[in-house]
Amino acid sequence: MKVLVIGSGGREHALAWKSAQDTSVEQVFVAPGNAGTAMEEKISNVPLNIDKFDSVKDFCIKKDIKLVIIGPEQPLVNGLADYLQNNGINAFGPSKYAAQLEGSKTFSKNFFIKHGIPTAQYASFSNFYDAVDHLKKIDYPTVVKADGLASGKGVIICDDQTQAEKALKSMFKEKAFGRAGNRVVIEDFLEGEEASFIAVVSKDKVLPLVTSQDHKPVGEGDIGLNTGGMGAYSPAPIVTQELNKKIMDEVMYPTVNGLIEEGHPYLGFLYAGLMIKDNEVKVLEFNCRFGDPETQPIMIRLKSSLVQLCLSALKDELDSHTIDWTDKHSCGVVIASNGYPEAYESNKEVSIQDYDDSDVKLFHAGTKIQDDKVVTSGGRVFCATALGTDLKDAQKKAYNLVDKINFEGAFCRKDIGYKGIK
């Protein structure tokens, strides 16, 4: 069997690496991939333009691809999954309609209210002056969000009206997030602890994966600008068994049943970004794909086949599928380029010291091979990921791996996993 993974980040390296471990898989293609996927056994990069759906379809037919796993959000929002499925190709990912849960904050907030899914109070605006006028009527802190896709960076927490006006100006006037900021959502600030809840969904069937917790802000202690994610760990102790059931009953099932009611049943990974306080849950956002960097610590804990899991969902056989996880804990630390999450440096040559430990794995993200050398090509460059007997052990191993990576301007957060170690 041949598998195609769409994307080029650390998430896609982890998905391709896991897919290649399946004995029924002879080859995994990654489009376009990165330096890490280029160096893996059974994995090949292909220079497909993933915005040209015809090219992806033709490649799948030519290579007899039996499963396409779509990693990033943009191709899903553009409708790649529908297009491939309509052409008889097994594409694992939601429809263009369902992907609006991530593609438009306004769509998702309206959906939450309509289907009784707990979330923060909000208002949506496509006019700068109307949005500024709204700022006079609300309490602070507040949260200003770009409506569209902004690589996880379009969320600004504002302590007062001045900061909120500045955020609106950056989105509407300065186009800091391009077209994603043509409409904004202003919502109540929620206090509590965040957790990532990711499940595999097929119509009304929801199979949760192990829990995880991301670290969005760029600085230690969760300060500074929001990023795509500076690291993650699994499991997240805040998500107890009781809370797990509450999330399924109050968030996941109402979401998938709501989409069925609207005539667009969900297929794919569904990721709920949650705020938890006093055992109550509210949805911050939905992502219609695996999180990055949560994928890396989750995939390293997965013992059973990712490919068979996706195929079971495509066949609507999730209710009879079981997932096998290691009891070990995992921790993934992102190594980023100087300047990230703003303008960052690239084309820095990377040196990687040898390591020999089956409990650790270096997933590449923003890397490419140039003149037979690995060089940086993105804001987030690697995710050093490790298994351990407990979180502290996994954290120690991950940071030991970080120490083996070197390039000019490299930095990471030194406290990934701190909330889970108390």
PLM regions and their residue ranges:
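Generic C-terminus detector
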Residues: 367-371, 376-422
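Internal nucleotide-binding/catalytic subdomain
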Residues: 158-295
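Solvent-exposed alpha-helices and their adjacent loops that cap or buttress functional pockets
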Residues: 21, 38-39, 92, 114-116, ...
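Active-site "cap" helix and flanking loop/linker of ATP-utilizing ligase/carboxylase catalytic domains
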Residues: 248-270, 287-359, 370
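ATP-binding N-terminal substructure of ATP-dependent carboxylate-amine bond-forming enzymes
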Residues: 1-97
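Active-site nucleotide/adenylate-binding loops and adjacent lid/helix of ATP-dependent enzymes
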Residues: 4-5, 101-185, 213, 237, ...
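Short, charged, surface-exposed secondary-structure boundary motifs
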Residues: 39-41, 100-106, 219-220
